[in-house]
Amino acid sequence: MAKKYQDLASGIAMGAVFMYLLRRLYESLRVKSSADSLEEDIVNGVEGLIGNTKMVRIKSLSQATGCDILAKAEFLNPGNSPKDRVALQMIRTAEENGDLVPYQSNAVYEGTAGSTGISIAMLCCSLGYDSRIYMPSDQSKEKSDILELLGAHVQRVTPAPIVDPNHFVNTARRNAANHTVDESIPGKGYFANQFENPANWQAHFNSTGPEIWRQCAGKLDAFIAGSGTGGTIAGISRYLKSKDPSITVCLADPPGSGLYHKVLHGVMFDLAEREGTRRRHQVDTIVEGVGINRMTRNFSIAEPLIDMAYRVTDEQAVAMSRYLVTHDGLFVGSSSAVNCVAAVRLAKKLGPGHRIVTLLCDPGSRHFSKLYNEEFLRKKNIVPQVPSSLDFVEA
């Protein structure tokens, strides 16, 4: 009997030891798994923060239309815009082609309305390059201030047609070439050429498009975006259409841009170009970052994929910017407001139950001097108001 109890006690003890060891093993694996998870959350440099931005449901717009209106929060990129993706792709492609070598006094030159320049300047700080940015003088001062803070050489250029050698893009191209041949300047210049560089649309085909598809679990009816260089709408549309050709792609275009008529009628034309109304600089809008009056290589990729287009007025963009702040706490820039106006128009056209995806491109903090400046707006004959409904968006 004593041996029986002794064996039982021994068995219980062994079982206790086994359970103790099993628990220790479990805890060690849990700690290791937790440590591994933490390690995976560490990225290498600011470039590692680019992409995988959140998708946000814009509650007020969704509730008002009965559609699921989602927006990719691209302002959450470290440079606060989707241009981070483009800048990184252009620089990496240039490195692969031997056009850029880090820490050799090489400089990246670009002509930009601001956001791409900010992304380039930010990445040049991290990747070992200088940055030289040429931007139109009518763009918000906030952007040039950020560029200078990031160490970029900034030149604000008087707006001019693209055929003018002093156009900001042509100025950037010319100075990049001069840098390379001038032996008195160390290193060489690389012209990023975002309007024509295929790395632009490829950045969105490789990252933004797949992210949208994954975040929506492949369930979306339409995608809406504006176009400046054309790279964003080209890359995302090309990816989404490759997954589901039935997805509707819609262009949101501001006043003065010829893309609206190019999509609808095949002619690059704006009403401002009518006989008797021509001006030296046709694009006359408070909206920054989208709208153009020429075909770019990147937009040529997008054009056959775009199914429809909406013209969005400055007044509508201003009203939407205030509406989003008041009803959703979303403080966004002018191109984002344009996108949201177009999203509501399309939602009204499609009817309840559809899912529409667009982009929130940059924060409102870059637009204090124009979009959120009441004095500036009144000079443009725009009276900023906080709308209580979406009646300012026609169906």
UniProtKB/Swiss-Prot annotation:
Putative cysteine synthase that catalyzes the conversion of O-acetyl-L-serine (OAS) into cysteine, the last step in the cysteine biosynthesis pathway. However, in contrast to cysteine synthase cys11, this CS-like protein seems not to function in cysteine biosynthesis, at least under normal growth conditions, although the transcript is produced. Keywords: Membrane, Mitochondrion, Mitochondrion outer membrane, Pyridoxal phosphate, Transferase, Transmembrane, Transmembrane helix. Its EC number is 2.5.1.47. This is Cysteine synthase 2. GO terms for cellular component: cytoplasm; mitochondrial outer membrane; mitochondrion. One of its GO terms (molecular function) is cysteine synthase activity. Belongs to the cysteine synthase/cystathionine beta-synthase family. It is found in: Mitochondrion; Mitochondrion outer membrane. It catalyses: O-acetyl-L-serine + hydrogen sulfide = L-cysteine + acetate. The chain crosses the membrane at residues 6-22. InterPro entries: Cys_Synth/Cystath_Beta-Synth, P-phosphate_BS, TrpB-like_PALP, TrpB-like_PALP_sf. It comes from Schizosaccharomyces pombe (strain 972 / ATCC 24843).
